[in-house]
């Protein structure tokens, strides 16, 4: 009887132990399932977060990429809308148009426009002469948007003249450039009318490699440029400087609000003044010709990577298209 009881006891103990083991396995399995579920949930949350970030990034990139850069055509269209008042000229090549304010000033005896001029070819001008001046393939002109901004008031030149502090060289808007004498307004319009391809400072600064598409790059009075723009232009193998004083001073730009700030050059900064902000030998060599306005002995001088005109032609180019004819032959 004792042996039988012991046997039953062992059997009961074994069943109890097996039940405990099974319960333990079941509990472990439930615990593991919970851990797995938690991990899956965390991974799902992370995945959703990453996906949302990617969508946001793509959205921002899309907005940025679709933000168009104003072109020369845009600027000329604006000029056509603002300069609508015709004034007669003895010049048989171009017709001139002014803004209303300048037109009023003109008839009050002040012929010097504040807002620049718009020019178009006179209908009587020889068509063949225009065709002869059409650009060579692979040529582009860079319109000096930044320089136009620098010469506005209040601006850089108010600072140089001691009329204001460094706020006049800091965060200056470069929107709405003007076709003035100081920004090669007439030269730019003539080249545009002749069919030259145009980029602006902004195009080159944002995408310096764009100049590699062109065989020849023509500079106007691109006095103020960024370091990226300077590097892209100065390293191009075939430049034509239609104006002295190009690539003279370094600026920084902020495309969030379309402003620019003077960094170096034009005897700035005051604690370490320098003339050419880039130490650019070609500009330094031809700098004195900036004030040669009559261009009586004009010529294109060969430089290591192109040619440089030895005068500032803005005053006379509307009457002397021979300069552009010679430029085309270079």
Report each predicted region and the residues it spans.
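N-terminal Lys/Arg-rich, disordered targeting/topogenic segments
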Residues: 1-33
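N-terminal Sec-pathway targeting helices
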Residues: 29-44, 54
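Transmembrane alpha-helices
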Residues: 45-51, 137-140
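Aromatic-Pro/Gly-enriched surface loop or interdomain linker
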Residues: 69-209, 284-288, 292-330
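A glycine-rich, often tryptophan-bearing local segment used as a flexible ligand/cofactor-contacting loop or short
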Residues: 223-306
């Amino acid at each position: 009887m004792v042996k039988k009881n012991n046997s039953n006891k062992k059997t009961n103990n074994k069943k109890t132990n097996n039940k405990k083991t099974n319960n333990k396995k079941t509990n472990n399995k439930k615990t593991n399932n919970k851990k797995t579920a938690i991990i899956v949930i965390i991974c799902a949350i992370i995945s959703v977060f990453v996906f949302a970030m990617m969508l946001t990034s793509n959205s921002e990139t899309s907005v940025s990429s679709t933000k168009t850069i104003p072109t020369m055509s845009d600027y000329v269209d604006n000029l056509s809308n603002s300069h609508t008042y015709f004034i007669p000229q003895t010049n048989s090549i171009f017709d001139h148009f002014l803004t209303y304010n300048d037109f009023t000033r003109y008839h009050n005896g002040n012929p010097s426009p504040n807002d620049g001029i718009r020019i178009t070819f006179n209908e009587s001008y020889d068509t063949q002469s225009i065709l002869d001046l059409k650009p060579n393939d692979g040529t582009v002109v860079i319109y000096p948007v930044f320089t136009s901004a620098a010469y506005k008031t209040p601006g850089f030149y108010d600072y140089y003249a001691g009329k204001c502090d460094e706020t006049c060289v800091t965060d200056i808007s470069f929107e709405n450039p003007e076709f003035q004498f100081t920004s090669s307004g007439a030269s730019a319009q003539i080249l545009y009318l002749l069919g030259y391809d145009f980029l602006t400072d902004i195009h080159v600064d944002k995408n310096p490699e764009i100049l590699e598409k062109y065989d020849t790059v023509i500079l106007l009075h691109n006095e103020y440029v960024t370091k990226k723009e300077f590097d892209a232009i100065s390293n191009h193998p075939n430049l034509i400087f239609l104006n002295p004083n190009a690539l003279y001073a370094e600026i920084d730009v902020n495309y969030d609000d379309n402003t620019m700030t003077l960094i170096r050059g034009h005897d700035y900064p005051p604690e370490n003044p320098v003339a050419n902000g880039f130490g650019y030998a070609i500009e330094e060599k031809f700098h004195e010709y900036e004030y040669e306005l009559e261009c009586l002995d004009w010529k294109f001088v060969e430089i290591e990577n192109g040619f440089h005109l030895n005068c500032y032609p803005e005053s006379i180019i509307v009457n002397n298209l021979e300069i552009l004819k010679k430029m085309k032959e270079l």
